[in-house]
């Protein structure tokens, strides 16, 4: 008799497969970085194209021209509206205090509605001084930036996304000095990211609604003689007689897509400015294809060119951070030589 081998279909690692709580992805873990900089950035997914580049990675194709699919993420400057400080608590980090900038855009007030009406520059400077005293006294163990996006700069929408980003480095005083310098100012992607480095991409995937077990879990369609009433797109057995309940591990129909996902080690091929990519000192090229990116339009601001595909639909908020578990053989942290960028219509 042949060996019976029937591995389960689908991974249980992501159960329960339900919709994400928020369309703005969260980052729970930050990489260790010796450079004092904001650890990541955020933008909006525009679409995909492809390029030809000289491969600079170790391998058989090194030094040769290769085809590479890339995703374009538009990244208008982020605005640093606050500083959040953490102290060491009994169960981990606890928020010690926050300092918010006193002048916020009217669009931001659609999202943030807890700022006191009498909060002015004098109150802001007083709060900043109190936080500096806590840092000097050693009560603060970590300092992070509170930032918001500016989608109105690219004519996408008005209400921004609000998020928190860690700061690299080991010295808390250096982190605070960096945050104090950046609060109330704009941050561009070229200030915090390096061309050629590896990134982790965090986003909420495309939503597909309720789907059956064949598409959702990848189970086999039943042989026609085993089907019940001609229906074979279901599991043949929901489980044993005992225990007298259906186990949660049985693949069944339900929500598919709109899940919070992280994809590791995506290389940042290039960073462009104002919708254009500078190829050399004399030549630059617009990244927008003929007719614009489908369902998105024209790239007006800075953008990231990321290798391969990333989760999420067009116009969705995408967050990136430096790779938290890079491979041993990393590509060089520099832009590879790009010989061709496809600008043909994607319609």
Swiss-Prot record:
Which GO biological process annotations does it have? translation
Listed InterPro entries: L3_arc_euk (IPR045077), Ribosomal_L3_dom_3_arc_sf (IPR044892), Ribosomal_uL3 (IPR000597), Ribosomal_uL3_arc (IPR019928), Ribosomal_uL3_CS (IPR019926), Transl_B-barrel_sf (IPR009000)
Q: Where is this region: Disordered?
A: 325-347
* Keywords on record: Ribonucleoprotein, Ribosomal protein, RNA-binding, rRNA-binding
**SUPFAM superfamilies the UniProt entry points to:** Translation proteins
Q: Which Pfam families match?
A: Ribosomal_L3
Q: Which GO terms describe its molecular function?
A: rRNA binding; structural constituent of ribosome
Q: Where are the transmembrane segments?
A: none
Gene Ontology annotations for the cellular component aspect, listed alphabetically: cytosolic large ribosomal subunit
Give the protein's biological function. One of the primary rRNA binding proteins, it binds directly near the 3'-end of the 23S rRNA, where it nucleates assembly of the 50S subunit.
**What does the similarity note say?**
Belongs to the universal ribosomal protein uL3 family.
Assembly information from the UniProt record:
Part of the 50S ribosomal subunit. Forms a cluster with proteins L14 and L24e.
Q: What is this protein called?
A: Large ribosomal subunit protein uL3
Q: Which gene encodes it?
A: rpl3
């Amino acid at each position: 008799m042949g060996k019976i081998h029937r591995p389960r279909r689908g991974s249980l690692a992501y159960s329960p497969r339900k919709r994400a709580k928020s369309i703005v992805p969260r980052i729970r873990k930050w990489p260790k970085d010796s450079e004092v900089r904001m650890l990541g950035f955020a933008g909006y997914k525009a679409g995909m194209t492809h390029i030809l580049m000289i491969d600079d990675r170790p391998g058989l194709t090194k030094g040769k021209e290769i085809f590479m699919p890339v995703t374009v993420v538009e990244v208008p400057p982020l605005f640093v509206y606050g500083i959040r400080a953490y102290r060491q608590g009994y169960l981990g980090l606890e928020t010690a205090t926050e300092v918010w900038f006193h002048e916020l855009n009217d669009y931001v007030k659609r999202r943030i509605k807890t700022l006191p009406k009498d909060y002015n520059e004098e109150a802001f400077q007083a709060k900043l001084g109190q936080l500096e005293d806590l840092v000097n006294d050693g009560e603060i163990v970590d300092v992070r930036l509170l930032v918001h996006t500016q989608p109105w700069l690219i004519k996408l929408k008005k209400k921004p996304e609000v998020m928190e980003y860690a700061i690299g480095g080991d010295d808390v005083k250096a982190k605070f000095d960096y945050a104090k310098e950046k609060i109330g100012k704009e941050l561009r992607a070229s200030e915090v990211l390096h061309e050629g480095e590896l990134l982790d991409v965090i986003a909420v995937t495309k939503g597909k609604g309720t789907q059956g077990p064949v598409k959702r879990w990848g189970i086999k369609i039943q042989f026609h003689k085993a089907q019940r009433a001609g229906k074979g797109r279901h599991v043949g057995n929901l489980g044993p007689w005992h225990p007298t309940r259906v186990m949660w591990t049985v693949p069944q129909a339900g929500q598919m897509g709109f899940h919070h996902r992280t994809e590791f080690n995506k290389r940042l091929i290039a960073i462009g400015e104002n919708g254009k990519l500078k190829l050399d000192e004399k030549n630059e090229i617009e990244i927008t294809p003929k007719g614009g990116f489908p369902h998105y339009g024209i790239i007006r601001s800075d953008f990231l060119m990321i290798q391969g595909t990333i989760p999420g639909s067009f116009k969705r908020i995408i967050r990136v951070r430096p790779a938290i578990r890079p491979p041993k053989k990393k590509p060089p942290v520099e832009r590879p030589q790009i010989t061709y960028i496809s600008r043909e219509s994607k319609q």
